[in-house]
A protein has these predicted regions:
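Glycine-rich beta-alpha loop elements in corrinoid/cobalamin-binding modules
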Residues: 2, 27, 36-118
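Nucleotide-activated donor-dependent transferases that construct or modify glycoconjugates
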Residues: 2-13, 62
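Short catalytic helix/loop segments, enriched in acidic residues and glycine
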Residues: 20-30
Length: 118
């Protein structure tokens, strides 16, 4: 069974609920084929120093974050750190700060080599 970690981390709000990540997890847990192959951790939502996630990253197979202008720099640090700890893990970015235009996406991929899927 693969372990999946999703999240929307706030760097500006003390209290933040990861609604989008929770909705994705809830949806996936209703599909037997997904539920039998993937275990979803509680979504990440609290800002912590990147190093505080080191132990958690060792046990995660798939890591996905929602990217906004206000959390992009922190997410970049977090994803890069995850790949250092778990180079075989799969990383995903989604959200409004991920480019859809093919030319911008190509540049984004070059600037974010630690992101596998966006």
């Amino acid at each position: 069974m693969k372990t999946v970690q999703l999240g929307t981390i706030s760097v500006i709000h003390e209290t933040w609920l990861p609604y989008a990540a929770a909705c994705l997890i809830s949806y996936c847990n209703k599909i037997p084929e997904i539920k039998s192959q993937y275990k979803f951790n509680e979504p990440l939502y609290k800002y912590k120093p990147v190093e505080d996630y080191t132990d958690k990253f060792k046990d995660i197979d798939v890591f996905g974050l929602t990217c906004y202008v206000w959390n992009q720099a922190y997410n970049d640090q977090l994803m890069s750190h995850y790949k250092d700890i778990n180079p075989q893990g799969i990383t995903m970015y989604g959200g409004p700060n991920v480019p859809e235009d093919p030319k911008l996406a190509e540049q984004f991929a070059k600037e974010h080599p630690y992101i596998d899927i966006f």
